[in-house]
Every structure is written in C-alpha cells, then in structure tokens.
Amino acid sequence: MSQAFNLVLFTEIKQAQNVKTGNDKEPNSKLRAIVRISERSSKKTPRATPRDDFVYTWNSTISLKLRSQLKLPLIQISVWDKQAHRSVYVGEVRFFLIGLLKSLAYNEHTSSWESTPQWYQLYSSEDKKSFSSGTILVQFRVQQHLSKKNLFFNAKSDVTLSDQTGSSDLLNQYIQAIETSTPRSLQKKAFDLSNPNEQRFYPDIETNALASSILDCEIDSMLEDFTYRKPNITESSLHDDTLTDTDFESIHSDPTIPSSALVPKRILFIEILSVTDLPPYKSFTRATFDMDPFVVISFGKRTYRTSWRKHTLTPVFNERLAFEVCDYEKNYDLQFSVLDKDKFSFHDQVATGFVSVSELLEEKTTDKPCTDFKPTSSNLILLDKPMNANESADNLLDTKKKKYKRNVNTDATLQGGLLRKYELVMSLDGKKNWSRKTKDEYIPILKFNTRFERYEILRRQLWMHLLQGNDTQMKGTLDLIELNYFVDCLGSNLSDKTLASFFEYYDKNPWVGETLTIEQVIDSLERLVFKRQCANTHENYIINIDTCPLCGQGRLSLRQDLDILKHLSICASRDWSTVNKVLKPSFVSSKAATRRWYSRLLIKLTFGQYTLGGNSANILIQDRDTGYILEEKMNIHVRLGIKLLYKSFDKANSRKIKTLLRKLSIRQGIKFDSPSSVSQIPSFIKFHKLDVDDCLLQLDEYKTFNEFFYRKLKPGSRPQEDENNSNIATSPADCRCTVFESITFAKTFWIKGRNFTTKKLFGSFYSREMADLYDECSIGIFRLAPQDYHRFHSPVTGTVGKVQSISGEYFTVNPMAIRSDLDVFGENVRCLLPIQTKEFGRVLVVPVGAMMVGSIILSVKENQEVKKGDELGYFKFGGSTLLVLFPNKRFKFDSDLLANSNNKIETLIKVGMSIGHTPEEPQFERHYRSFEEEPVDQQLRIIRCITGGSTFEESKQATQRRNELLGNEGSPQEKDLQVENLSWEAKNMNLEELEENESLLLYDLVNDGT
C-alpha cells in the first residue's frame, strides 16, 4: 500500500536548548536525536555539542518512508546523551501521526506538505521516570519520493511531479488509507501515548504499548487476572498540536459497513461427543484394521479439527467449539468429515455428513423447547428430550484434569440454556469402492450436542455474574461510588456524567446516595452498548483488559471494547469442567485438514502461503451459496509461471514480456478458432470438471474450441434474483468477485497497481464529467476464470450509451497480478460500456481482456434498451474481468460481499445473484433450501462442487451404459460387469433413485469376486 503513495516524512531536527544532560560533570556533552515511527523504522542524527549558551545545533534532516500499514501511528523523537561507554536518556517528544499530517499545509512551489518550525517540550517516559527539561526545535515536511524504478518507468512521459501525485489531495488519500488499515483501537492508543499524564510522564511504550498501568482489582475469581490501563489524557499540554478527545473523534473517519447483516448476533456451541460404527480399514499387514479417526468441522471460512484417537472404531472425543453466525451465514451448511490419520500418506476420508445451520438455530419456547421441532434433513436425528447445559456432564467428562493432576471446578452459573442432542447419520466416502456388505453393515453415526445463544443474553449473564461478585454486602443494589469502582475495575473510562445518566433514567439522584438495582444497572449497560452499536461511536470504552482470565488469550486490548465483551461472554458461557478441549480454527479449508505436514510445506514453498486472502499462487475463494472454501483449479505450470512472473514487477513490465504476452494471446486465439481445436474440448471439461448440462448445444455441435468456450446456456439456467425489482443490481457474470465502496478502499485492500486511477482506466476518453461521476465511485471487480461461463450480462435495467474501445496489453487478471505493482486494469485491453439507469444513475461496465483472451465481443449497440440479465457480450478463450462502477451515493453493495472483500477474499457468485441495491431498498434476503428439496441434478452439482467428482458428461455416459447392460436386451455380459461401468453417482452417492439398479451390478460383482 505504501508503494501506491511513495510518501516520505522529512523531520528536520534543528536545535535544542536548556537540556539537562546525563552527566553534569561533563560540560561538553554530545547529544543525539533518534526519530522512530511505530517501532518499525528509525534513524538518528549526528552528535551535537553545546555552544556557550548551552544550545545544541543539529540542522539535520531525517527521512522515513510513510507506510499505510503501521503497528502504531506514532512518531517518537528521543534525545540521548552519548558518553564514553553508554548512552544516557535525556527526554523525548511524541506526535500522533494522523493529527500531525492533518496539520501540514500544502506548498505549491515545492509540491510538498510542510509545517512551520516549532519548539516542543521534552518529557520523560514513564519507565525512565527521570527529570527532563529543555525544548527541541522541529519542522516536518512530507513529499512524494520517486525512486529509480519510478523514474525509469516514467521516463517516456513528460509528466510533472504534481501530475503524478494527481493533486494536493494525495496526503489526504494517504491519511484516509492509514485510517482504514489501522484498527480504531490502535489509533486511540497512539493518541493516548502522545500525551503526557498528570505527572508529566509519557505512557510506557516498551513494556506495554497498549497499557500504561496495571491495577490489581478483585471483583471475584472472574476478575482477579484482569490487567488493564487507566486513561491518561491530560486536560492541557505544552504541545502546540495537542489533541483532545473531541479533536481525536473529529479527525477520525473510520469506514464501516452500515449493515446489520455483518454484525454477529448469535453464537453456536457444538460439543463433538463420539462417532460409532466406523468401517475397519485393513492395515498394511492385513492382520488387523487400521483406524485412527478424527473429525473435521467446516463452516464458512472456519475449519476445526479434533484430536485423533488411536486404533478404535468407536472414538470418543468430548471436545467443544464455538463460532459466530451472521445473518448472511444462516443459509450455510455445517460439514462434518471423519478421517483416518495416516503417518506418511494423505489422511483417508471415511465418512461425510451435512447439517443446515438454520435448523440448529431454530428458537423454541422454554415450555416446549424441542418436542415440536423436526429437522428437515433426513439423516439428522434429534433426540426427544433436550438436556440442560449442566446435565450434559453425563455425556462429557465430570472434571477437567490439568497438569499435576489438579482438578478444576468451575462455577456453572452461566451455563443456562438447553442443549439439543443430535445423531447425524453419515455417508461413507464415495470415492472408495466399498463392498455391499460393508455399506450395509457399517453406518457411521456422529453424536453431538448443540446450543445457541444470542449475544445480548450472554452479555446480560456476564454482567449479572460480575455485578453479583462486586456486591460484597449482598444488598442487590449499587450507588454511584460502587458503580464507579466497578467500571474502574473493568478498565473503563466512562465519565461520571455517563454513570449519573444511569440514575437519571430511573428518576433517581446519584448525588444523595440513591441506588440502582443490579437489573437496572444491567439494563443501563445494555442501552449503552446498543447506542454504540447503532451510532458506531467510540468516544468511551466500557471495558479494556489485556488478558482473558478464562482462556488466557492475550492482546485483547488491541480489540474494540465490544469485541472484548463478546470474547468474555463466550468464555464465561462455556462449562470448562465438562469438556476435554475447546477447539479453535486450525485450517483454512477442509481440504487442508486432510494434508500431511510435508504436503503443506511443499505447497507453501512452491506456491506460497496457503491462507485466505493471501497474495500467493494458492487461490482460495468462498462459495456464496454454501459458504465452503474452495481452491481454484489451475494447472501447476500456470500457477508457478504466474507466481514467478508477477512477483517481480521489473520482469512483468519489461518490453519483452509485454510482446510475448501479446503474441501468445493472439496466437492462442487463432489456434482455438481453428476446427482442429475441437479435440481440446473433452480434456478441458475433464480437467475443470465442468457441468455441461446447462449448455444450449450438444458437445458434438461445437465446431471450434472457442465456440464451446463462449457457449450459451439454456434459458432459465441463470435466474435473476428479484427480477422485477429494478432497485437491485445483479451479478453480470459467473465469477469471483470483490467489491469496494470507493476507489480508495479498492486500492487499499486489493488493487496495488502503481498510480491506478480512473483517469488511467478511462484513457483518452477521460473527461471532467467522468471525473465527477467516477473518481470516488463504488467499484465491483468480477474476475472470470477459464472454467467459468464467459458471457457477461447487464447488472441493471437501462439504456446503453456510446461504447469506447481502448487498446492495451494482455497481462493476467489473476489476483497475484492485481495485487502486485503492475497496473493491470490501467494497461490491459478494455471497453467502456455505459448504461443510463433511473435508479442508479450512470453505471459503467468495463470488460477487461487478459492473458490468452483473443478478443472482447459486444452483443449490444448504442441507445439499445437492456433489462437486468440481458446479454452484453462475451470473451474468447482466456481469463478476463468485468469492472462495474456505480455512483456511490446511489448504490450500496451487499454486506456479505463487502465483508469478504475487506478481508481480501473473493466470493464465488453466478449470473443473476444480487450484488447491491439503492440506499432506500433493503438488501435482498436469500432463503435456505435444504439438500433434500433440491432436484437430483442440483444435488449432484453441490456434491461435485464439494468433493471434486468426475464430470457430468462422464456420469451420463456411465448411466447410458448401465441402461444398456440392464435393458430389455437380456442379462448383462460378464465382461461388461466392471467397476468402471458404474456411474460417478453410484460410486459417490447413495441416492434412492440410483440404488436399485446399481445395486444389481454391485451384487453381481461381489459374487464374481471382482
């Protein structure tokens, strides 16, 4: 991100006077100043000796590169007395970086932002606690710096520095970027650390950058380990640029996603109890069975794995996990997989089961909590009687054994709620050729308990427990002094005025000793939490601790106080005495959980880090329908080539590489337009496991490979969500999408190309009118992989404007290239296709060609009326991208797409899915359909997507072969009774529609001993 700005902070240390040195006996002390930014980079000045008037003069300028990802946005200038064998600390001055940058003024003559020289008082840090005196004269200047690389690449143009920066707003763009990338809590901490406390000491950075004091408070056993900091904001300071709390709130602009769908409202607890009736794998010696099972649980972007049990067919786990569920995740499935641990090879898949989270989240009254509840999944069995959380100890361990055989007894007052006990009938892995006897004899059943709670209920239980522990006299009430002591023990900085408002709400006067009941205090705290959630304000924090006293997790003070409350509520709601282990997310995807350590090491060394949102050759995306994390299918040599090519900006931008990619793309396009290219179609389908059922034509009707590549689909195969509502925009393509509320956010999180701007995107067609419309527009990036359907459609209803074509290069649109220094969207071949709409204004669709793309073909003309979902054009062979630009004041993207994009995760969507809406229109709500309600073809698609089974065409051929074998022509021939003749569905699924016919073949094969 810093490479997009190339800003450098020049700090000119001029003089220091009236400084008390480290050794009064040495009149000729030598002082040195060190400038440090967020402990990531620092430089020092030369030594300076005093003049007769004890004035130290440096006149030295220190340059430090400004990065938009800072651990702490803080500038520290410390002064040291250099002696013979050691350096003695003299004092320091600190600056809040964001406030300092906003105080700089732009100088048009030097094309830089400058401050006037000012004297600043030196203070001591709290850990030194030495007497500091004197002042230091400092001046700051920020300027864009062009490195040798930048100068080389811009050598062909006569662009001036001011042209490259765009305008004097570049610094404001950087400030906005750093505010976006730096958590709100860290900005508040940096502001606190830049102000000395009442004793004229700076809060300590070295020992604890996020807390200045540790106060031992004992509310009860829940609070005895809390460490927190007291607020250290002074009312006045000798800094000329000192900022108050109000100033801090006014200079901060925290971009948020204004949607309740992103706020987790509930927590789901799952206890993995046991698995029964696992099939015996034969060991290497064939003398006994080999089964060391463990369970992998996948939900959305989270994957958990239990510990493994040695040599057993009925493992008992007794392990618990908890995860948040957002509104947009209610339609996701919860996947359970049982695997057999192998020491040297891949872990073997044994059985798989799926449960809809919406079934587990159904709320019931306390009178009849579960008797009328019937899960829709046929393989999910809910036991008749629900259990209380405290009664679940019969199925779990009674106590938790820790080190040195010490029993830990936990108070279970927070363990309310009912546990539902389920038995999930799992399917044996379809990729293994189980015998009919094995399938009939072994039916694995996973036993687990679930309980879900809403966050507000967990918080109220937490408040009740803490307040009861603080009520030492058992009065059940608190006055203002007791309430103030309680919030101080939590590390809160709530003012007396805020606490007094708790009493005023109930018409009570806190200043005459009137009290509130514990329930009234809880209601007041919940009103405060609700107010902060709605207004998204962070003026005060309710709780601030460093370490959780229950699970021991540290660095909690890096989070917002509401996040700390969530963490404590979850920890407090767990019954630690009844479980062996609490699971934490361990893997990126369920596929990664099956790999051995050396496989993961090889993938990391070859393709890069295997992580969600990582900039590597491992492309992981999230399926919007199911929530599963999928790994994009790509040839190994292509994956390695992209990594080697685009990890180096010099190579990718060289003239040879550009020429090579252009020739390769044109040559490949000509090759796939030839009739001989038809032979490539079957291998392409087989490698990418494509579903060809939706194709409008049969495979033998395509004359060239390109005709198949930009194939049309059958009518109705891509239905439009809320088709008659023109206030909702839909996806223009089957693609992997990322969306952002502005170009600035897109450059911060995703597009890392040097100097990417809308001006460069529009090329010679850039105008003032387009600048006003699109300079700060909402942008959607829809990337099409080679295996996707390559026709693109209109996302809105409107009139097509004048289409402009822009020639360019043929760089790949792979995420690794987009997140490199290369400006792919500003240099690749592209078209500008405007659509004038009533609801959204002027929407701009930009088809961008990429590597191997022969051409971009448009199907619409100027002034043509298009409806949402109408075809606009198609790409010939290769990867490609669609950019869709909306005026941000008239459009909002869907919250789930924004959440993934801000985490640098692409979302897999299809044509017709909702992507956004007008500000007045509510977000389109997707409804869950159970697996059993889907038609058979759709069930096959879902399982193919998850398991990576064979293609549908192969399945059809196998089915036809089966009908021939079992048709009216007589009994099948023995030579035809081979396992290869079975369809993929028969090998991988246990559908009732296929079981009867396929079982005949399986039975005969078993009897024949094949």
Curated annotation (Swiss-Prot):
Pathway: Phospholipid metabolism; phosphatidylethanolamine biosynthesis; phosphatidylethanolamine from CDP-diacylglycerol: step 2/2. Gene3D superfamilies: C2 domain. Residues 458-493 form the EF-hand domain. It is found in: Golgi apparatus membrane; Endosome membrane. Residues 1-114, 247-370 form the C2 domain. Its cofactor is pyruvate; Ca(2+). Binds 1 pyruvoyl group covalently per subunit. Is synthesized initially as an inactive proenzyme. Formation of the active enzyme involves a self-maturation process in which the active site pyruvoyl group is generated from an internal serine residue via an autocatalytic post-translational modification. Two non-identical subunits are generated from the proenzyme in this reaction, and the pyruvate is formed at the N-terminus of the alpha chain, which is derived from the carboxyl end of the proenzyme. Heterodimer of a large membrane-associated beta subunit and a small pyruvoyl-containing alpha subunit. Interacts with pstB2. This interaction may be a means to structurally tether the donor membrane (ER) harboring PstB2 to acceptor membranes (Golgi/endosomes) harboring PSD2 during PtdSer transport to the site of PtdEtn synthesis. NCBIfam families: PS_decarb (TIGR00163). Catalyzes the formation of phosphatidylethanolamine (PtdEtn) from phosphatidylserine (PtdSer). Plays a central role in phospholipid metabolism and in the interorganelle trafficking of phosphatidylserine. This is Phosphatidylserine decarboxylase proenzyme 2. It comes from Komagataella phaffii (strain GS115 / ATCC 20864) (Yeast). The lineage of its organism: Eukaryota, Fungi, Dikarya, Ascomycota, Saccharomycotina. The gene is PSD2.
